[in-house]
Regions:
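Conserved non-catalytic scaffold segment of RNase H-like nuclease domains
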Residues: 2-133, 148-170
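Acidic, divalent-metal-coordinating active-site segment for phosphoryl/phosphodiester hydrolysis
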Residues: 171-184
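Mixed-charge, glycine-rich, non-catalytic linkers/tails in nucleic-acid processing enzymes
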Residues: 186-196
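Conserved beta-strand -> loop -> alpha-helix junction used to position metal-binding or nucleic-acid-contacting
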Residues: 130-143
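Generic alpha-helical structural context detector
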Residues: 141-144, 160, 181-184
Length: 196
């Protein structure tokens, strides 16, 4: 297993190895903070094996609460799209099975996504101590270490800088795919610079 960074014991150093088998995740939520009651409304992920995309996961989640208009404006996800969709427990059960053969997940600003996945696990299993069970790499850490001079390390900025896309779509699966391409570009840059 790769070296860990300080803080969350699940967090791995993005420069501790050349990851080739991993899952890249992205989430869409009803707000910015689990602590303020925001909930998951979409999980998107891509499974990578030997640097090739081999599987995708994309599920909407019914939070059983209103999706704020600013979230609908950003993601296009509204209340009508979530009616009849599975609840958090059903989706987390399926996501856990889907992730079970891969030890490492990645996300950009992973603490955000992981906090929502931790909360979803806690809600799904009525266990306040439960947590999402995978080690994770934060590509935000990698960007900051590669380019400490940059003012912005947002996905929307980086995907343009690395010529991946013109804009972030703010839908979980498409964002996960962009973050996968971003990780590969930054990892290759780190290798060229002798950082990996």
């Amino acid at each position: 297993m790769a070296a860990r960074r300080s803080g969350d014991p699940r967090r791995l150093d993005p420069l501790s190895g050349r990851f080739t088998d991993y899952i890249v995740i992205d989430t869409e939520t009803t707000g910015l903070s689990v602590r303020k009651g925001a909930r998951l409304i979409e999980i998107g992920a891509v499974k990578i094996h030997n640097d090739e995309l081999v599987d995708e996961f994309d599920h909407l989640i019914n939070p059983f609460e209103h999706v704020p208009s600013r979230i609908t404006g950003l993601t296009g996800i509204d209340d009508s799209m979530l009616l009849g969709k599975p609840d958090v427990r059903e989706v987390m059960d399926e996501f856990a099975r889907w992730c079970s053969d891969t030890a490492v997940v990645m996300a950009h600003n992973a603490s955000f996504d992981i906090s929502f996945l931790d909360n979803a696990v806690q809600l799904a299993y009525a266990d306040r101590d439960a947590r999402f069970a995978h080690h994770f790499v934060d590509t935000l850490d990698l960007s900051r270490r590669l380019h400490p001079e940059k003012r912005s390390h947002k996905v929307s900025t980086l995907i343009v800088d690395y010529h991946i896309a013109d804009m972030e779509e703010h839908r979980a699966l498409s964002d996960a795919k962009q973050e996968w391409m971003l990780y590969r570009a930054m990892r290759d840059e780190a290798e060229l610079l002798g950082m990996l």
